A protein has these predicted regions:
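Small-residue-biased structural context
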Residues: 1-189
Length: 189
């Protein structure tokens, strides 16, 4: 089980950053399923413990930040832009899709709670059998990410450069990263 090396886009490209995070979501969700198989064959050895630690770190830190990026910044901006576009049917469709994926966040958080408890035990060296929720988590999270990309992120063209810069700045702040006020994308936001 190997970690996925990845160079992420900068916060000046917030949609690309969110999509890159989805690649990591897919990777770590799959890895949780692979870990269950690995444990059956090799037990909770050092590699299994390290893998559990990495999955925990990703979904405990990056996962909640990603949902906050969407729920606090991207989704409200897209809702407002869709409503302002004057295309009421398209705005209703986009707002409905946003409502649905936000509901999925709650379901995914519940699945994560079960998977998390199991991973914490594996990290401590206990070769516990994976809960049924691991397979559901490993399938549902990547499907959710694909849905967001196909039904929501594709509408990022509704946003202005200033709105995207504001989203990127808020993503940076959420992660404790310093924004350069001389950067025109940041200064205009």
């Amino acid at each position: 089980m190997t970690l996925m090396p990845m160079t992420l886009p900068g916060m000046d490209s917030p949609i690309e950053m969110l999509a890159a995070c989805h690649q990591k979501v897919r990777h770590f969700a799959r890895l949780s399923s692979q870990l269950a198989v690995y444990l059956d064959n090799k037990g909770a050895d050092a590699m299994a413990q390290e893998t559990a630690r990495n999955i925990l770190r990703y979904f405990d830190i990056a996962g909640p930040l990603h949902h906050q990026d969407e729920e606090q910044d991207l989704f409200p901006a897209l809702r407002a832009a869709a409503r302002a576009s004057g295309d009421a049917p398209a705005a209703r469709a986009l707002c409905g899709a946003i409502d649905e994926v936000q509901s999925e966040h709650v379901v995914l958080d519940g699945l994560w709670a079960d998977v998390r408890n199991w991973l914490e035990r594996v990290e401590l060296g206990y070769p516990d059998q994976a809960p049924e929720g691991v397979e559901i988590f490993a399938v549902q999270y990547p499907m959710h990410a694909g849905r967001e990309e196909a039904e929501i992120y594709v509408h990022a063209s509704l946003l202005t450069e200033s709105q995207l810069a504001r989203i990127g700045r808020r993503m940076s702040e959420r992660r404790g990263l310093k924004c350069d006020a001389s950067d025109p994308l940041v200064a205009d936001a």
